[in-house]
């Protein structure tokens, strides 16, 4: 795969994942206790022997830059690199990135210098494990100009995706980005042609783009130069290219989740605790997911009841109950707490004993979960300070609420406590 260049799209402002994107770029959002979203496509690239990788971003990229530079530092003995390219203003391009295609266009001067045959364009907010070598080989075998990775989906989620129709040879003959109403119904197909059984085909009568593309190098450069007013791959570049180019579909038949919303992010993380076999597993030695080595001590569990949960390294868990939850690195849970259906992202550092005691003397909660606290159906962002006897249970069953001044939001009924938030003793949410 030395002839392939990887391009990962960092996405926009991450409004659907807000407030998790308040202080970080979307690809830098923590995942599964110890990873970040960006680790998924980068690891897939490395496992597929694609070692030349650019990541395009423009919002809150400081923590993403730090993570990439500390994690994916290829040695000087290979051409391999992983580099973040932030949006920039120039005389030729005075505006920020206007869309996915525009982001690639603004750096096309850099991309075209590489002596490669194909570009693989990836998204930074998906959870899946994929061998891109098979995907690229299919692209080459069919003589395609562009190949899209696709999945069959049902009617409920179909309007959120780019949908297509294909012929008997897998060629895309029609493409519609996020259709609704009659336009949606018009995109129904018999997905048995993809190998689904009749029952599955009935449940999933649409073919959706995963937002993952392989382009012949010159085809991509030509498309970007010809349509300078076209800023988005899904809405403009792909639908127009399907008319004049050989655009092929590649069926991906394993687990894949778009985790661009708070609800999808929450469900994907807690889905990792599913028994006996989760839909996605980080325990695969053949295709591991890489992240930064932090050299943390083992987790300390002191007389706790922990069931159906993932506990990351470096945690301190006292006499408490934890069920169906994910605890991130350096999470601290004090005695008599109940944590259920919750993702706790952990902390960036440990507070020394003296500082924790000083916080308690001043009436300010230290980092972690205080004694006697109950948390259900929530996401607790990093470095949050949850006081004693706090109830984070969405008592009023609120679906949406913006209480940033109090340190939390509610999204789709899920309470999201902000990074660095302070929730005082006795608070009820």
Curated annotation (Swiss-Prot):
Highest taxon, organism lineage: Bacteria
Pathway given in the UniProt record: Glycan biosynthesis; glycogen biosynthesis
UniProt-listed Enzyme Commission number(s): 2.7.7.27
Binding positions for alpha-D-glucose 1-phosphate per the UniProt entry: 162, 177-178, 209
GO BP annotations listed: glycogen biosynthetic process
Pfam families (UniProt xref): LbH_GLGC, NTP_transferase
Catalysed reactions, as listed in the record: alpha-D-glucose 1-phosphate + ATP + H(+) = ADP-alpha-D-glucose + diphosphate
UniProt entry tagged with the keyword S-adenosyl-L-methionine: no
GO molecular function, one term: glucose-1-phosphate adenylyltransferase activity
GO cellular component, one term: carboxysome
Keywords: ATP-binding, Carbohydrate metabolism, Glycogen biosynthesis, Glycogen metabolism, Nucleotide-binding, Nucleotidyltransferase, Transferase
Entry keyword annotation includes ATP-binding: yes
InterPro entries: ADP-Glc_PPase, ADP_Glu_pyroP_CS, GlgC_bac, NTP_transferase_dom, Nucleotide-diphossugar_trans, Trimer_LpxA-like_sf
Gene3D superfamilies documented for this protein: Hexapeptide repeat proteins, Spore Coat Polysaccharide Biosynthesis Protein SpsA, Chain A
Quaternary structure note: Homotetramer.
General function of this protein: Involved in the biosynthesis of ADP-glucose, a building block required for the elongation reactions to produce glycogen. Catalyzes the reaction between ATP and alpha-D-glucose 1-phosphate (G1P) to produce pyrophosphate and ADP-Glc.
Family: Belongs to the bacterial/plant glucose-1-phosphate adenylyltransferase family.
Protein name as annotated: Glucose-1-phosphate adenylyltransferase
Organism name: Picosynechococcus sp. (strain ATCC 27264 / PCC 7002 / PR-6)
GN (gene name): glgC
């Amino acid at each position: 795969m030395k002839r392939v260049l990887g391009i990962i799209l960092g996405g926009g402002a991450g409004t659907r994942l807000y407030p998790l994107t308040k202080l970080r770029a979307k690809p830098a959002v923590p995942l599964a206790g110890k990873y970040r979203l960006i680790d998924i496509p980068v690891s897939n690239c490395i496992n597929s022997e694609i070692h030349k990788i650019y990541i395009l971003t423009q919002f809150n990229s400081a923590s993403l830059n730090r993570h990439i530079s500390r994690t994916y530092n290829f040695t000087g003995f290979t051409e391999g690199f992983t580099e973040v390219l932030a949006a920039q203003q120039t005389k030729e391009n005075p505006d920020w990135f206007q869309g996915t295609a525009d982001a690639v266009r603004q750096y096309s001067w850099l991309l075209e210098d590489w002596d490669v045959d194909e570009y693989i364009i990836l998204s930074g907010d998906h959870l899946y494990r994929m061998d891109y070598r098979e995907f690229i080989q299919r692209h080459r075998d069919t003589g395609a100009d562009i190949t899209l990775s696709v999945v069959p989906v049902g009617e409920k989620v179909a309007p959120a995706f780019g949908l297509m129709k294909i012929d008997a040879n897998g060629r895309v003959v029609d493409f519609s980005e996020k259709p609704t109403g009659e336009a949606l119904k018009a995109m129904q197909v018999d997905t048995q042609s993809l190998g689904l059984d009749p029952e599955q085909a009935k449940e999933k009568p649409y073919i959706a783009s995963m937002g993952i593309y392989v382009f012949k190098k010159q085809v991509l450069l030509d498309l970007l130069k010809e349509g300078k007013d076209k800023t988005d791959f899904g809405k403009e570049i792909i639908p127009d290219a399907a008319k004049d180019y050989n655009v092929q579909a590649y069926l991906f038949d394993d687990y894949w989740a778009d985790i661009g919303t708070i609800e999808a992010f929450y469900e994907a993380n807690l889905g990792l605790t599913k028994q006996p076999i989760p839909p996605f597993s980080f325990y695969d030695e053949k295709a591991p997911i890489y992240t930064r080595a932090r050299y943390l001590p083992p987790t300390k569990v002191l007389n706790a009841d922990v069931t159906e949960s993932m506990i990351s390294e470096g945690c301190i868990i006292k006499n408490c109950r934890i069920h169906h939850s994910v605890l991130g690195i350096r999470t601290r849970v004090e005695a008599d707490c109940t944590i259920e259906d919750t993702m706790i992202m952990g902390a960036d550092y440990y507070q020394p004993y003296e500082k924790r005691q000083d916080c308690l003397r001043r009436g300010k909660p230290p980092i972690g979960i205080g004694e006697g606290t109950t948390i259900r159906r929530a996401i607790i962002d990093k470095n949050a300070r949850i006081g004693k006897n706090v109830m984070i249970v969405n008592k009023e069953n609120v679906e949406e609420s913006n209480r940033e001044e109090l340190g939390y939001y509610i999204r789709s009924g899920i309470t999201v406590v902000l990074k660095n938030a302070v929730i005082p003793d006795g608070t009820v949410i």
